[in-house]
């Protein structure tokens, strides 16, 4: 790491939720059913998750459903993809500001990282709209596995997909960012 990068990391402050939301509206990406947001990673909505032909066309080998559950969910499950040879991982998360999605940050990031360890794999990360729960988990992946700050992760994703994590999820991502930045500062001093 260069001294300029180290200085930038030391000067970095986690942006407010309001500041982060400004990046969502300035990304300039129109809302679509699915977007490739990282090599081999697609974020999409329920329609994409249920479109077996589209999944085959995209070459999807793995699915992370960030909307399992009984309320505002996508109830596909592993059975839905059984005959397609798609590896399925589901997260029971509600898209409400009070829901603790941070409990899935590390496990989802690990699943994404394991999926991407084979360059032939392609992952669809989805929720109902592909804008809040799935985006939040992918932002956590970028922060945890790619060592991005929250701001870097938001900028990376917002230029590839129209996202809008709810206010509570943004607060949890901010807490993760603060924790990771403190941890990185400790290891560099």
From Swiss-Prot:
The keyword Nucleus applies. One of its GO terms (cellular component) is cytoplasm. Its EC number is 3.1.3.16, 3.1.3.48. It is found in: Cytoplasm; Nucleus. Pfam families: DSPc (PF00782). Its main location: cytoplasm. InterPro entries: Atypical_DUSP_subfamA, Dual-sp_phosphatase_cat-dom, Prot-tyrosine_phosphatase-like, Tyr_Pase_AS, Tyr_Pase_dom, TYR_PHOSPHATASE_DUAL_dom. The keyword Thylakoid does not apply. Coiled coil: none annotated. It catalyses: O-phospho-L-tyrosyl-[protein] + H2O = L-tyrosyl-[protein] + phosphate; O-phospho-L-seryl-[protein] + H2O = L-seryl-[protein] + phosphate; O-phospho-L-threonyl-[protein] + H2O = L-threonyl-[protein] + phosphate. Keywords: Cytoplasm, Hydrolase, Nucleus, Protein phosphatase. Residues 33-182 form the Tyrosine-protein phosphatase domain. Dual specificity phosphatase able to dephosphorylate phosphotyrosine, phosphoserine and phosphothreonine residues within the same substrate, with a preference for phosphotyrosine as a substrate. Involved in the modulation of AMPK and MAPK1/2 signaling pathways. PANTHER family: AGAP008228-PA (PTHR45682), DUAL SPECIFICITY PHOSPHATASE 29 (PTHR45682:SF6). Belongs to the protein-tyrosine phosphatase family. Non-receptor class dual specificity subfamily. This is Dual specificity phosphatase 29. It comes from Danio rerio (Zebrafish).
